[in-house]
Amino acid sequence: RQHRLWLHLHGDSDAIERVLAQDPEARILWAHSGFDRPEHVRAMLRKHRKLYADLAFRNDHASGGKVDPAWREAFIEFPDRFLVGTDTFTPERWYYIAEHADWSRAWLADLPPDIAERIGWRNGETLFASMMAPKK
């Protein structure tokens, strides 16, 4: 709380609800969007205005360069609340970074350009710039 850091929460929606019950002002980046269905992710984003979701280590939101229709609805409804992610928690995963970047660029190109830009990098820049503000 004191430093207004982001919590990168690896958990399901129940874990998010419990954290927010203790600290309604918590700033949460929901890892892997909880591996939940897009309809449920949308419901959580509607309910919690300070909740953001990353798309790391999941591939159900796009296939063959095309965004899944249910995920498209989520991205259009909440263009400022999703971030692309890679989840390179083991060294072996670094080998696939270029391939993952190409895959992400392909499905992002299936979205309107402004939404693709936000999800692809601008949302991350905005979120993490808020932690870099000079101290007064």
Language model region names:
Residues 80-81, 91-136:
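Mid-to-C-terminal alpha-helical segments outside catalytic/metal-binding sites
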Residues 32, 53, 87, 116, ...:
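Divalent metal-coordination and catalytic microenvironments
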Residues 1-84:
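Catalytic pocket-lining loop regions of alpha/beta-barrel enzymes
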Residues 22, 41-42, 63, 67, ...:
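Charge-rich, low-complexity amphipathic helices
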Residues 35, 59, 89, 123-126:
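Residue-level detector of flexible, active-site-proximal loop/helix-junction positions
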